[in-house]
């Protein structure tokens, strides 16, 4: 048992299963926990299929999503694995980023080959910034013909290349989740082989503290005799006292200033880092120079923009969304990080309207600039009510 207390030092990676309905995503998830439980019992509990299948609902950015979270460890890593029972849940999870993935296991039934949702999930993985994919060719016990197997593998590789993944070099592992779950030793070994491929082909993600500093401003106030303080949660990076920062977004001009103090829970700190809620004392800045919704950044690392292309999921009526479709020139509020900015929507050519429950591609023109990068997530709101959620795919200007 002494081994377990070292687990904090293991690299942590977030992954998930994606792929067509009934190709065996949930069975594979359960089977992974079983073979790892059998191989390294003191680190891994077994999570049965039923427990994953009845995934609890979560609310993320005003959208309800069913997501199952499973944890397990290989010899070298600690994994958090997400699996969604329904196809709609996948779309919502990918677009809202409810559960960010550092890599995905694409499950394709060898008996069927790639199907429409296989394509859709790979496209969503590309759009939502899932960087790496490992393929599990499932139900391999049901295909005797080696040529069919090779054909399916080829199709999957072509599909991955089509969506700008590394189709030529991506690992494709033949598995039978059901057989492994039933305790078949040979198929259990193949599943361990799949996890070895995941260990070796999904790189360790860069930690938030290693990225350039960024903090969205939540509040601004004046402390008599000390100056202006802005508060917020540091999204990424590290900031030290006396460093220079830029304040960008909302206004047309950026402001450059020096941080003369960093406070947390009324204590003074030498530095603040990703995940911490802090107050920053800014030199020579008046209360009216800064506002909620702007971002404080390491100079030159992010720029404000007004026009971008996005992919968005629009809530259905049952989810508390709109009851009617919207058309070109729709003008909702786009909520980025800590503030709403009005934007005008232009639909993709050939799209007349967007129905509640759809996922849509659109171009947005904001009336004020927002500090953004590709991959930034937002919520679409009308009068404070969430009607959709999306992600910046490409910045135009």
Swiss-Prot record:
GO MF terms on file? GTP binding; GTPase activity; translation elongation factor activity
Ranges for domain tr-type G: 10-206
Q: What class of enzyme is it?
A: hydrolase
Region feature (G3): 83-86
The EC number(s) attached to this protein equal: 3.6.5.3
**What Gene Ontology cellular-component terms does the record carry?**
cytosol
Q: Could you tell me which PROSITE patterns the record lists for this protein?
A: G_TR_1, G_TR_2
InterPro entries registered for this protein in UniProt: EF-Tu_GTP-bd, EF-Tu_GTPase, EFTu-like_2, EFTU_2, G_TR_CS, P-loop_NTPase, Small_GTP-bd, T_Tr_GTP-bd_dom
Binding-site residues for GTP, renumbered to this chain: 19-26, 83-87, 138-141
UniProt keywords, alphabetically? Cytoplasm, Elongation factor, GTP-binding, Hydrolase, Magnesium, Metal-binding, Nucleotide-binding, Protein biosynthesis
Region G5: which residues?
A: 176-178
Q: At the top level of its lineage, which domain of life is listed?
A: Bacteria
Location in the cell:
Cytoplasm
Query: Catalysed reaction per UniProt?
Result: GTP + H2O = GDP + phosphate + H(+)
Region G2, as annotated, extends over 62-66
Ranges for region G4: 138-141
Renumbered residue ranges of the record's region G1 = 19-26
Q: Which residues bind Mg(2+)?
A: 26
A Pfam entry, by short name: GTP_EFTU_D2
Q: Which family does it belong to?
A: Belongs to the TRAFAC class translation factor GTPase superfamily. Classic translation factor GTPase family. EF-Tu/EF-1A subfamily.
What is this protein's function?
GTP hydrolase that promotes the GTP-dependent binding of aminoacyl-tRNA to the A-site of ribosomes during protein biosynthesis.
Instruction: Quote the subunit structure annotation.
Output: Monomer.
Q: What is this protein called?
A: Elongation factor Tu
Give the organism, scientific name. Streptomyces cinnamoneus (Streptoverticillium cinnamoneum)
């Amino acid at each position: 048992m002494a081994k377990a207390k070292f687990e904090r030092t293991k690299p942590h990676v977030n992954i998930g299963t994606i792929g067509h309905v009934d190709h065996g995503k949930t069975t594979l998830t359960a089977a992974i926990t079983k073979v790892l439980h059998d191989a390294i019992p003191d680190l891994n509990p077994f999570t049965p299929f039923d427990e994953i299948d009845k995934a609890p609902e979560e609310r993320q950015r005003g959208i309800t999503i069913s997501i199952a979270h499973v944890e397990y460890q290989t010899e070298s890593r600690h994994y958090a694995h997400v699996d969604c029972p329904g196809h709609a849940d996948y779309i919502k999870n990918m677009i809202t980023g409810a559960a960010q993935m550092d890599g995905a296991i694409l499950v394709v039934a060898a008996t069927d080959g790639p199907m429409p949702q296989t394509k859709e999930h790979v496209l969503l993985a590309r759009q939502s910034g899932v960087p790496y994919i490992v393929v599990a060719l499932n139900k391999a016990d049901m295909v005797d013909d080696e040529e069919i197997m090779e054909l399916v593998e080829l199709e999957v590789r072509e599909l991955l290349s089509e969506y700008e993944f590394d189709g030529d070099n991506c690992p494709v592992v033949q598995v039978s989740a059901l057989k492994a779950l039933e305790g078949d030793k040979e198929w259990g070994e193949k599943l361990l082989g799949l996890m070895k491929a995941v260990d070796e082909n999904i790189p360790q993600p860069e930690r938030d503290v290693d990225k350039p500093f960024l903090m969205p401003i939540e509040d601004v106030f004046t402390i008599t005799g000390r100056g202006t303080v802005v508060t917020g949660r540091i999204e990424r990076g590290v900031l030290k006292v006396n460093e220079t920062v830029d304040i960008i977004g909302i206004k047309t001009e950026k402001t450059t200033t020096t941080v003369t103090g960093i406070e947390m829970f009324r204590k003074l700190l030498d530095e603040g880092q990703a995940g911490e809620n802090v107050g920053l004392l800014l030199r020579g800045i008046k209360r009216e120079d800064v506002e909620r919704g702007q971002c404080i950044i390491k100079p030159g690392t992010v720029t404000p923009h007004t026009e971008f292309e996005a992919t968005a999921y629009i809530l259905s009526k049952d989810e508390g969304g709109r009851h009617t479709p919207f058309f070109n020139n729709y003008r909702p509020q786009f909520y980025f990080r800590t503030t709403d900015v009005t934007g005008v929507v232009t639909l993709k050519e050939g799209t007349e309207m967007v129905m509640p429950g759809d996922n849509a591609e659109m171009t947005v023109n904001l009336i004020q600039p927002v500090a953004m990068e590709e991959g930034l997530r937002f919520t679409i709101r009308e009068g404070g009510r969430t009607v959709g959620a999306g992600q910046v795919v490409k910045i135009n200007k």
